[in-house]
């Protein structure tokens, strides 16, 4: 295992990411994950927002953007998996290189830019999954969408994934999509929030909805958003 990790670190980080996920998928299909990555189920389950998580360790959005690795990641025993960020239309994301490894800091920085295969592809993947744990779906807007079209992108994704998501995350935080963080302003956030609230009712979606904000946003802006919610 250490040899494999050492080899992956010699490769560009995005290629390492690709190889690792596909290797995990092969191990899953060969029924080898439980042998190579044994885990126990002794962790105490807990409830949050009406959902029952078998443990507190999960997969955040960004690792499996398109739901291609739900079953293999689920076999590792995570308490939840969040897929995405997904957009209505497929898009390639930013030009490469766009993932950067900082070994001394034990860190990776990504500037992927919402690269994904589109919401219709994701829906096919989650419909056919074997994974039965908590599934979150992270939704976003296409790079070329502005104004009302950007709001429409979120609504389209919401409508298409709501039947399959245990919770939905509305991602307005990405610095890699030009103008997306303008949705943090009250005048732009309110129309989005009202549209999401409306589609939640029409789709009869009673599960949690989370808003992903920029981690370095000013506290006053966050306060305005929470007041609106």
Where are these regions (language model features)?
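Flavin-dependent oxidoreductase catalytic cores
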Residues: 1-229
């Amino acid at each position: 295992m250490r040899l494999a990790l050492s080899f992956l670190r010699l490769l560009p980080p995005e290629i390492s990411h690709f190889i690792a996920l596909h290797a995990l998928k092969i191990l899953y299909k060969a029924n080898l994950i439980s042998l190579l990555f044994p885990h126990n189920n002794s962790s105490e389950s807990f409830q949050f927002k009406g959902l029952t998580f078998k443990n507190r360790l999960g997969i955040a959005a960004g690792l499996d953007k398109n739901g291609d690795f739900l079953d293999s990641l689920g076999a590792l025993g995570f308490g939840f998996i969040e897929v995405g960020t997904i957009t209505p239309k497929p898009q390639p994301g930013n030009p490469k290189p766009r993932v950067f490894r900082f070994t001394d800091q034990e860190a990776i920085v990504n500037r992927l830019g919402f690269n994904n295969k589109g919401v219709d592809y994701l829906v096919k993947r989650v419909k056919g999954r074997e994974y039965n744990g908590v599934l979150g779906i992270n939704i976003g807007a296409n790079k070329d969408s502005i104004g009302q079209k950007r709001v429409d992108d979120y609504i389209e994704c919401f409508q298409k994934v709501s039947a399959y998501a245990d919770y939905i995350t509305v991602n307005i935080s990405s610095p890699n999509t030009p103008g997306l963080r303008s949705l943090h302003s009250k005048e732009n956030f309110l129309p989005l929030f009202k549209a999401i609230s409306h589609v939640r009712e029409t789709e009869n979606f009673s599960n949690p909805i989370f808003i992903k904000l920029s981690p370095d946003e000013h506290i006053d802006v966050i306060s305005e958003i929470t007041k609106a919610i």
